[in-house]
Amino acid sequence: MEANQVIRYFPEQNAAYVRIKHMTNDPDDGKELLDFFATLEERGYEHCIIDIRGNTGGNTMHWMAYIVGPNFAEMPRCDFYQLLKGDYAREYAECYGISARPISELPLEELPELCPEDLEGVDSFLVMENGTMKITYGAFEPPLYTGRFWLLTDGLVYSASDSLAADAKASGFATLVGERTGGNGIGYSPVIRCLPNTGICFRYDSGLGLN
């Protein structure tokens, strides 16, 4: 079976590299990352390159628990907004313990590039802490690795991997290098509904995330 993570060391460049193909939240993958960061600190490497190109997502806990949490003594708070339409979306958010606010309270002064079309039909919004929901990082004291992080991205970066990119950019955790991501990382799990007559189930994005 092909490994989900690929690690390389470049001692002459004082840098190391890890490619993460999927956000699995697998304990074995997590241990490999924790050992990797500890090794970088022990060897005094200045740069850590995290390559998430082609990573279409998975579980956000993978990067929270094994990438950001272990390497930030105190994670700065970064608020994002998600726009909602309709009662069902609001009720779905409440299942996650998040209360929607009326759209009239959206701080437009913080969103100067927001397109008016994005607000059409929108009646409420959520404040998403660190891109998803209220996050409790398993912070390490001291952090496992204190060097500089670089995050490689492309257009296939989506969902859970996109939330890492958004969070890393807003918080300053890493310098992003590459292409614009595919999005859909700001928010929570897709809404699931079933048609009343056929019983066919479908899912769709819970809202529109704003970076």
Task: Go through the PLM ranges and name each one.
Residues P143-L144, K169-A170, L195-T198:
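A structural signal for short secondary-structure junctions
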